[in-house]
């Protein structure tokens, strides 16, 4: 019961924060002309899925950008398809045969050779709208201490199965209410896609955290520990694909659960050795995030 009450209180706080701050857009800077690297990590994705994402990224209104397709596939047919797509659409292809740090290691290797000021990341099944960068970049240009701007992740294939429909509903609660609360309490974390990051902020912490299966949240913690700020912009400019069967859904949830456990262990180490590294409300939000998947143990 204490576990449930704590998380219920956390959700209530998020709702209140959303009501207080949700209608007040943050101040944005002038229209940007900074360079942006659009990164699309892919591993064993169907050709048509990657192609759709490439097309939507290339169709963005913002022109000062370069598109990078990062292929981490181990099967030759997928590698060949990625090569064909990169050649057909004139995007830069980065192939990787390493196994260091999974997605984080792949992105870090690419980051080492980038010169662009900002990095936009979209999973291979996420389709951004043409105005995405025009809407998001002004916030980063207006605040030099803003490390990243996270936007919602909503699914467009909810009619495929009940699993997809339920996954969408689960995500909707998180992105509509919880994220607003976390952002207002200076603890919004990167969700790994539909996000634009400042490259210098990533360089400041040595790139994405390669020691966690949820590199996005672990990296966000590192940024907040270094006093970088984050922002959640609650406008849906990207639509993706939900898990369509129970196998895919449980694989997704298992990865998030494992990442939460890893985050909790790291938090405890910092909490008892360097409590002043975060503000009280940041600690509370990160503890709620890292213990969410403990709900099963709470009912044992």
Question: Language-model segments: which ranges?
Answer:
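N-terminal membrane-anchoring/stem segments of glycan-assembly enzymes
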Residues: 1-32, 86, 285-300
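Cell-envelope/extracellular polymer assembly enzymes that use nucleotide-activated donors
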Residues: 34-37, 66, 218
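A conserved hydrophobic helix/loop-capping motif in glycosyltransferases and polysaccharide synthases
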Residues: 37-45, 60, 139
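Short, acidic, metal-binding catalytic loop of nucleotide-sugar glycosyltransferases
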Residues: 55-64
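A conserved acidic beta->alpha catalytic loop
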Residues: 71-82, 98-99
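Long helical/loop segments within the catalytic core of UDP-sugar-dependent glycosyltransferases
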Residues: 87, 94-118, 130-213, 224-225, ...
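Catalytic donor-sugar/metal-binding loop of nucleotide-sugar-dependent glycosyltransferases
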Residues: 211, 220-239
């Amino acid at each position: 019961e204490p576990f449930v009450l704590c998380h219920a209180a956390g959700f209530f706080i998020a709702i209140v924060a959303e009501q207080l701050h949700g209608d007040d857009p943050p101040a944005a800077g002038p229209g940007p002309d900074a360079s942006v690297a659009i990164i699309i990590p892919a591993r064993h994705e169907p050709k048509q899925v990657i192609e759709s994402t490439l097309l939507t990224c290339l169709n963005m209104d913002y022109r000062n950008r370069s598109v990078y397709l990062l292929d981490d596939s181990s099967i030759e047919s997928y590698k060949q398809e990625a090569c064909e797509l990169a050649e057909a659409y004139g995007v830069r292809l980065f192939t990787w045969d390493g196994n260091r740090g999974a997605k984080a290691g792949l992105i870090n290797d690419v980051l080492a050779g980038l010169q662009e000021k900002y990095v936009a990341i979209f999973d291979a099944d996420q389709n951004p709208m043409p105005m995405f960068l025009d809407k998001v970049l002004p916030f980063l240009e207006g605040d030099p201490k803003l490390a990243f701007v996270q936007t919602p992740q909503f699914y467009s294939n909810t009619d495929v199965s009940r699993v997809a429909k339920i996954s969408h509903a689960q995500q909707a609660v998180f992105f509509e209410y919880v994220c607003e609360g976390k952002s207002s309490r200076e603890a919004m974390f990167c969700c790994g896609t539909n996000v634009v990051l400042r490259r210098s902020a990533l360089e400041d912490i040595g790139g994405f955290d390669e020691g966690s299966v949820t590199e996005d949240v672990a990296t966000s913690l590192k940024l907040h520990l270094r006093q970088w700020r984050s922002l959640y912009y609650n406008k849906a400019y990207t639509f993706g694909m939900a898990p369509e069967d129970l196998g895919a859904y449980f694989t997704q949830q298992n990865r998030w659960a494992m990442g939460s456990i890893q985050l909790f262990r790291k938090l405890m180490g910092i909490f008892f050795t360097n409590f002043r590294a975060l503000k009280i409300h940041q600690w509370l939000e990160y503890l709620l995030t890292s213990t969410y998947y403990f709900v099963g143990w709470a009912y044992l």
